[in-house]
């Protein structure tokens, strides 16, 4: 799927309210990880954050841009903001595949076949599923960033002056 298709799909999910759970997860993640995110902003280590920090200190980028870059870096590094929900949703996807198999063969799916289906789903779809989830998270972040920039930059304005 081209990036235009990805963006269109994300906009559709947003409009239908399908990303609300991720909104709540992201809110909790940011609030639970304020110290880590602020540390990344202050120290700028890894994932290009050191360059963003240097540019911020020279006045080349503003608070919002620094926060945006650092939060995106933390999300990319973690790959999730709610591992439990991600696992549950992946299990749900696997259960749908098991159901499809049951419908196809017109009988209950045995434990051994269920395991095969789960392994097959994991090898064929898990990495793309996680990539899509990260796209969703970054999209939600983009939509909600203005709410979090003030929370994350509480102490940063004084740091640039010194």
Description of each model-found segment:
Residues 2-162:
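Polar low-complexity intrinsically disordered regions
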């Amino acid at each position: 799927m081209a990036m235009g298709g990805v963006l269109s799909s994300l906009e559709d999910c947003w409009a239908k309210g399908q990303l609300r759970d991720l909104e709540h997860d992201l809110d909790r993640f940011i609030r639970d990880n304020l110290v880590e995110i602020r540390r990344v902003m202050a120290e700028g280590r890894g994932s290009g954050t050191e360059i963003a920090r240097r540019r911020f200190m020279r006045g080349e980028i503003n608070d919002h841009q620094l926060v945006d870059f650092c939060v995106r870096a933390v999300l990319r590094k973690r790959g999730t903001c709610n591992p439990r929900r991600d696992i549950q949703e992946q299990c749900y996807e696997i259960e749908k595949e098991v159901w499809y198999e049951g419908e196809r063969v017109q009988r209950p799916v045995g434990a051994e076949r269920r395991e095969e289906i789960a392994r097959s789903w994991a090898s064929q779809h898990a990495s793309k599923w996680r990539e899509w989830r990260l796209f969703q998270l970054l999209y939600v972040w983009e939509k909600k960033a203005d709410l979090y920039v003030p929370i994350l930059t509480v102490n940063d304005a004084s740091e640039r002056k010194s």
